[in-house]
């Protein structure tokens, strides 16, 4: 036995009030997304961790394949939402274009910010079913990549560093935009917190 503590996931507070992203994301939409959906991933991940803990302590068998698949889904959802809340902010403080090293890399790898925005938006709009558009950085090639993640855990490239994410699950926008995902994606650009995204990038260079 050792005295190391086993920790579990917790729902974080948002870095802004629930009405801070209006009119682009309503208070109602953000509240439900955070308190219900993000909380569900916290609960799902913790339930799987406890199930695995109990099986190990009692030396009983579990369906490892099913448990690990479900765990990756819930943990992926938990982590991606952490990035999502952090890379948004009030429209009067956010939006526009990035600056500094991130702007230089976007121009290097995409040709222009306009081209990057177009490709990222296309990745978000065309994601099949539920998923995410994700801007990442590959240290091996010193390049920015766009990933189109299905659900929370499919098409994720290992070891790529996450910079910017956009949730395109219907629960992220249906109250405000119904089934018109392109309008939601367009509105997202008004609330991107580029200072936070730039900080994420600078921290890994």
Swiss-Prot record:
Entry binding sites for Fe cation: 33, 81, 167, 171
Enzyme class: oxidoreductase
Molecular function in Gene Ontology: metal ion binding; superoxide dismutase activity
Catalytic reaction list: 2 superoxide + 2 H(+) = H2O2 + O2
EC nos: 1.15.1.1
InterPro entries: Fe/Mn_Superoxide_Dismutase, Mn/Fe_SOD, Mn/Fe_SOD_BS, Mn/Fe_SOD_C, Mn/Fe_SOD_N, Mn/Fe_SOD_N_sf, SOD_C_sf
Gene3D superfamilies membership: Fe,Mn superoxide dismutase (SOD) domain, Iron/manganese superoxide dismutase, C-terminal domain
Protein's recorded name: Superoxide dismutase [Fe]
Originating species: Methanothermobacter thermautotrophicus (strain ATCC 29096 / DSM 1053 / JCM 10044 / NBRC 100330 / Delta H) (Methanobacterium thermoautotrophicum)
Organism lineage string: Archaea, Methanobacteriati, Methanobacteriota, Methanomada group, Methanobacteria
Gene that this polypeptide is encoded by: sod
């Amino acid at each position: 036995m050792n005295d190391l503590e086993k920790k579990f996931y917790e729902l974080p507070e948002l870095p802004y009030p629930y009405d801070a992203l209006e009119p682009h994301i309503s208070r109602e939409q953000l509240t439900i997304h955070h308190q219900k959906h993000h909380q569900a991933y916290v609960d799902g991940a913790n339930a799987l961790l406890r199930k695995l803990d109990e099986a190990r302590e009692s030396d009983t068998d579990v369906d490892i394949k099913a448990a690990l698949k479900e765990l990756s889904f819930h943990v992926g959802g938990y982590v991606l939402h952490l990035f999502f809340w952090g890379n948004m902010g009030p429209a009067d403080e956010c939006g526009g274009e990035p600056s500094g090293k991130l702007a230089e890399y976007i121009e290097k790898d995409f040709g222009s910010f306009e081209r990057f925005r177009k490709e990222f938006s296309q990745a978000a709009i065309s994601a099949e079913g539920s998923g995410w558009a994700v801007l990442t950085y590959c240290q091996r090639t010193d390049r920015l990549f766009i990933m189109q993640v299905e659900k929370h855990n499919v098409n994720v490239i290992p070891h790529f560093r996450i910079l910017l994410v956009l949730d395109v699950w219907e629960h992220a926008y249906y109250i405000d935009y119904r089934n018109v995902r392109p309008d939601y994606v367009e509105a997202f650009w008004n609330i991107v917190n580029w200072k936070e995204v730039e900080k994420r990038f600078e921290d890994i260079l």
